Amino acid sequence: MSRIAETFARLRAAGRIALMPYLTVGFPERTSTLELVPALEAAGASLFELGIPFSDPLADGTTIQRATQRALENGITIADCIATVAELRARRVAAPLLLMGYYNPLLRYGLERACAALAAAGGDGWIIPDLPLEEADDLRQLAAAHQLDLIMFIAPTTPPARISQITAQASGFLYIVSLTGVTGARQTLAGNLTDLIANVRQQTNLPLVVGFGISQPAHIAEVARIADGAIVGSALIDRLERLPPEDRVSGAAAYIRELLSAVARP
């Protein structure tokens, strides 16, 4: 059983859902991720989505775009992101670690090279928001050969026939996009989220993890009623931007604990 599968099985047995923070590798400072991930894991985070900086992050709103630009200014590359995963494992981080990035930089780096390196570093998979299902076979097969998962997306606008195609090829968990548009904290989630998740549930036993717009305990409570996990990204990056350097780690951990107060399943 993979580390991702073990994590969701353990949480399910405990009656809880997963909280998965998103962090841009190398933001705010080059080594910040190495300090933040262990602290957030200790605060109760279950998995981590670690963003590879890219100059044209199409799926991301202004908050993560700023974080990405800062990380690029700090000189962060794909190789640095993979090395960060290895260092986090050396620091005894046990949670699943997935790299999120865009396809062109990964293609330039080399799919086989990237999968082999991420597996050797102790990573668990890829999240590639601009990779359509029709073009995913190469990376999906290489990832599987290295015991990595390629996480696939389902959005409110995904047609039923395409949901069936995605669930047939998915592994690890499914990333359920809670609303249309780019990433960013919102006050409310999509009204049809419950129906979307019910439809997907009929077609897969994989865990369903909701992302985009998650920012407050009420959102976590809403997701806990219908899904297996929630991803918090832009709201966490916002906090890191606002906090003074000496308070970033403790403040981020406090935010995770605040969100987790709503994570127990009813």
Curated annotation (Swiss-Prot):
HAMAP family associated with the record: Trp_synth_alpha
Record GO terms (molecular function): tryptophan synthase activity
Alphabetical UniProt keywords: Amino-acid biosynthesis, Aromatic amino acid biosynthesis, Lyase, Tryptophan biosynthesis
GO biological process: L-tryptophan biosynthetic process
Catalytic activity: (1S,2R)-1-C-(indol-3-yl)glycerol 3-phosphate + L-serine = D-glyceraldehyde 3-phosphate + L-tryptophan + H2O
Enzyme Commission identifier(s): 4.2.1.20
CC per GO annotation: cytosol
Entry-linked NCBIfam families: trpA
Subunit-level organization: Tetramer of two alpha and two beta chains.
Name of the gene encoding the protein in the UniProt record: trpA
Entry similarity comment: Belongs to the TrpA family.
Reported function: The alpha subunit is responsible for the aldol cleavage of indoleglycerol phosphate to indole and glyceraldehyde 3-phosphate.
Protein name: Tryptophan synthase alpha chain
Highest taxon above the source species: Bacteria
InterPro entries, alphabetized: Aldolase_TIM (IPR013785), RibuloseP-bd_barrel (IPR011060), Trp_synthase_suA (IPR002028)
Catalytic residues (positions): E49, D60
EC category name: lyase
Protein species of origin: Chloroflexus aurantiacus (strain ATCC 29366 / DSM 635 / J-10-fl)
One Pfam family recorded for the sequence: Trp_syntA
Record pathway: Amino-acid biosynthesis; L-tryptophan biosynthesis; L-tryptophan from chorismate: step 5/5
